[in-house]
Amino acid sequence: MEIILFLTMMVMITYVFSGYLYRVALVQSSRVDLIFTRFENMCFKIIGTDLEHMSAKTYVKHFLAFNGFMGFITFVLLIVQQWLFLNPNHILNQSIDLAFNTAISFLTNSNLQHYNGESDVTYLTQMIVMTYLMFTSSASGYAVCIAMLRRLTGLTNIIGNFYQDIVRFIVRVLLPLSCLISILLMTQGVPQTLHANLMIRTLSGHIQHIAFGPIASLESIKHLGTNGGGFLAGNSATPFENPNIWSNFIEMGSMMLLPMSMLFLFGRMLSRHGKRVHRHALILFVAMFFIFIAILTLTMWSEYRGNPILANLGIYGPNMEGKEVRFGAGLSALFTVITTAFTTGSVNNMHDSLTPIGGLGPMVLMMLNVVFGGEGVGLMNLLIFVLLTVFICSLMVGKTPEYLNMPIGAREMKCIVLVFLIHPILILVFSALAFMIPGASESITNPSFHGISQVMYEMTSAAANNGSGFEGLKDDTTFWNISTGIIMLLSRYIPIILQLMIASSLVNKKSYHQDKYTIAIDKPYFGVSLIVFIVLLSGLTFIPVLLLGPIGEFLTLK
């Protein structure tokens, strides 16, 4: 009942919040202008931008240049961190390959962590590098999504200014909400301090170092920005990051807030096309929510069912291996599905200890990479499937392929297919390399089916810019650091460039009014068709390897 109530509340909250996002996205005046405008203008002066509207090509150039500069600075700071200030725990520099992976991971909103937060990064890098990139990577994804929506919906005839979009989103959305969430988490016991680790003597007489630091400030944007990288190695399974059931709900709600609001924002932007087309966003929301609930139900069933091998020994009950007692199997499964559906990557239990079908659920969500998804880019990925569904359905019934009164031609379809293929190609090719290269396969700690699942989960998490992992895998090696770094880089920027190209190409075409010769995108059957094509296309791509991994493991448990 608490899960149903929580999900219902989040749907209502995100619908209301989308109204505020609409004003931010369209640079409309609001009551908070007096508070934020001066700070925004100061940021614009520091950046040196004149706020002129950019072309799509210029927008992408500035997006890539901004991200490239941040990535370089991050890499340098990580390899010299031991000589900088705010290092009371005397942490050493990261290796070149680990710094490469870490910089790309946080730059791309993935937060795949091949390091231990307690022992491999200083307070300075936690705040200046990790926390800063959590803001900017999230805002970058939002900015390019809004640019795409402006073009597709025809709400304005401009794509916008990249720096204006990113600054407004950080100042008016991320910073205020992060401060609020940080305070809420501190009231629940999450630490916020710059003191060195505590050194205590245990009851057995041994010395133990207890790691903490500025956790609350990182924890808030970690979930709000769908980042996922933990201050501590145990992530949100540790009491310092996620002390109780209330902090657990705060963190889950933070993950869901902005990606769900983006779909409602899309609906508000479609309002110029009339009430009928406005319902299109609702159809998309219901379709994605249906897949979300289906995967959640499957995961919870598997986790509550437990391990059949233990049941044969007379030990019944849910699968509690790798889980925190304060959350139990239900809230652990919910957190797992939310963190992979919204591509956050934060964990409150160990995914490597999930049952085979329990691990299949989050893996499938990352392979689909469209069920709400991360900040901005999740909606962009969904729209690619929408365009693909419109095109296929139109050809099947002999109608004209068009979307929002814009015809879909050969040029757009080439880009759409390329965006669709990038994701599985990166996952499957690099997974094959991991099994072929001896040094890489030595990182697998489990034999047979589960070892395949470990590799597939790692590569899928990197390609989906998620960041969670089956942490039994020994991933801090040169191969895993470089390979996953390349995957995160390519899977982030190539689709974004192509998606903006698609939007610009569509809007430059001659539009015409919807008639009987076009597919109605506001009808329930379109939502059903979308679900079928998402499952069918992704199923054909990944079902062979899933049979070798989690499904094969499930069939061996008797």
From Swiss-Prot:
Localization in the cell: Cell membrane
Record membrane topology: Multi-pass membrane protein
Keyword annotations of the record: Cell membrane, Ion transport, Membrane, Potassium, Potassium transport, Transmembrane, Transmembrane helix, Transport
GO molecular function: P-type potassium transmembrane transporter activity; potassium ion binding
Database matches in InterPro entries: KdpA
GO annotations of cellular component type: plasma membrane
Record's keyword annotation contains Transport: yes
Superkingdom of source: Bacteria
Membrane-spanning residues: 1-21, 66-86, 127-147, 166-186, 245-265, 281-301, 327-347, 354-374, 377-397, 416-436, 482-502, 531-551
Its job: Part of the high-affinity ATP-driven potassium transport (or Kdp) system, which catalyzes the hydrolysis of ATP coupled with the electrogenic transport of potassium into the cytoplasm. This subunit binds the extracellular potassium ions and delivers the ions to the membrane domain of KdpB through an intramembrane tunnel.
Complex formation: The system is composed of three essential subunits: KdpA, KdpB and KdpC.
HAMAP family named among the record's database cross-references: KdpA
Cited PANTHER family: POTASSIUM-TRANSPORTING ATPASE A CHAIN, POTASSIUM-TRANSPORTING ATPASE POTASSIUM-BINDING SUBUNIT
Stated family: Belongs to the KdpA family.
Protein name (Swiss-Prot/TrEMBL): Potassium-transporting ATPase potassium-binding subunit 1
